[in-house]
Amino acid sequence: MADQKKVSEAAKEREIKISSSDNEIFLVPRNVIRLSNTINTLLMDLGLDDEEGTNAEPIPVQNVTASILKKVISWCNHHHSDPISTEDSDNREKRTDDIGSWDVEFLKVDQGTLFELILAANYLDIKGLLDVTCKTVANMIKGKSPEEIRRTFNIKNDFTPEEEEQIRKENAWCED
């Protein structure tokens, strides 16, 4: 029993080397990076999950730059002790008003950074970060007209007035 406790404490203290797409290396505590299902699966597949110490070769994260990976690690560090959700996300009502105050402050970034965080959370399979970033974008859209959404996200309207009218007629039932 005491040996198991030592192993779990060692695993908690273990650091994982991760390399960003621009070759910056980060040392991340194992209990922090556990939020990434992608990294967890890789460590298990390579048989590195139970070893003590630090992996010799960094795990490459080719789709994430150092600046974004730093933010992802910061988010994981803040949330590493949160309980892992066991709810089936398909069976519960989607809400966008349940973003914690720390996350609201953390996500006060420019749109480009927000979208890069979404891509990184998706690539690294960090469900909590993906949920909170997508909710932030949903809140940016909520209650806005199509024109306001275009302005918010700098989207060019490529519909002709006739095409727009046709779409309005086909979707009139949505606005009742």
Curated annotation (Swiss-Prot):
Ubiquitously expressed in the adult. The keyword Cytoplasm does not apply. GO terms for cellular component: cytoplasm; nucleus; SCF ubiquitin ligase complex. SMART domains: Skp1. GO terms for biological process: female sex differentiation; negative regulation of centrosome duplication; negative regulation of DNA damage response, signal transduction by p53 class mediator; negative regulation of gene expression; negative regulation of intrinsic apoptotic signaling pathway in response to DNA damage; nervous system development; positive regulation of apoptotic process; regulation of protein stability. The keyword Hydrolase does not apply. GO terms for molecular function: cullin family protein binding. Keywords: Developmental protein, Neurogenesis, Ubl conjugation pathway. Disruption phenotype: The majority of animals are either embryonic or larval lethal. Rare surviving animals develop into uncoordinated sterile adults with hyperplasia of tissues including the uterus and the spermatheca of the somatic gonad. RNAi-mediated knockdown results in a reduction in brood size of the injected parent and embryonic lethality of offspring between gastrulation and the two-cell phase of embryogenesis. RNAi-mediated knockdown causes synapse clusters that are retained rather than eliminated in the secondary synapse region, anterior to the vulva during synapse development. It comes from the Eukaryota. SUPFAM superfamilies: POZ domain, Skp1 dimerisation domain-like. Probable component of the SCF(sel-10) E3 ubiquitin-protein ligase complex containing F-box domain-containing protein sel-10 as the substrate recognition component. Interacts with cul-1. May interact with the F-box protein mec-15. Interacts with dre-1. Interacts with syg-1. Interacts with sel-10. Belongs to the SKP1 family. Probable essential component of SCF (SKP1-CUL1-F-box protein) E3 ubiquitin-protein ligase complexes, which mediate the ubiquitination and subsequent proteasomal degradation of target proteins. Regulates cell proliferation during embryonic and larval development. Involved in synapse elimination in early synapse development. May negatively regulate the apoptotic activity of cep-1 in response to genotoxic stress. Plays a role in sex determination. PANTHER family: SKP1. This is Skp1-related protein. The lineage of its organism: Eukaryota, Metazoa, Ecdysozoa, Nematoda, Chromadorea.
